Curated annotation (Swiss-Prot):
Subcellular locations according to the entry: Cytoplasm
GO-annotated cellular components: cytoplasm
Gene name, Swiss-Prot/TrEMBL: tma-22
Protein's UniProt name: Translation machinery-associated protein 22
Comment on protein domains: The SUI1 domain may be involved in RNA binding.
One Pfam family here: SUI1
Amino acid sequence: MTALTGRPVVYCGVCSLPPEYCEYGGTVKKCQQWLEKNQPTMYSRIWSPEVLEAEMASLSVEAQERAMKDAKKKAAKAEAAEQKQADKRANSVVTIKRIERNKRKYVTSVSGLEAFGLELKKVAKDFGKKFATGSSVTKVPSGGEEIVVQGDVSGEIEEFILEKYKEVPEDNIELVEDKKKKKGEGN
């Protein structure tokens, strides 16, 4: 009896679906570009003008009009979402805050990384490995999350973020020093 082998399936590098299903996602244009670059034979099988014309010819006139309308609507929606994401990234700020805990003890808080598509748990683990300290993801009362690293490593964290995570621009990183109020300073 011969052993059964699985059929190799190609997955899109953009949306992670098989290329035949990319048209149902929101990133059709990017998926087409990726497929044309990485799998030209499959691209010609799915997206060549002849294939598209043949598919359109098999539809009724009303269905063709509806398909064109839907395609335009999807493209506009995807473009708007992409623009919104780019604006969000451009306007978001990564705040690295040095907070005094006790007399000479500090913790460093990093917030705003999630806007750049980074997984906070992985980044926290990287910080812990890099600086040989404890680091964790904590929830902030305002609703977001931040990474808290033990020790005064704010300058090093800024350099590490710029070096390892290229998607975070240098202009969007802000260093803040937070001092604990002395007992006499209060109300």
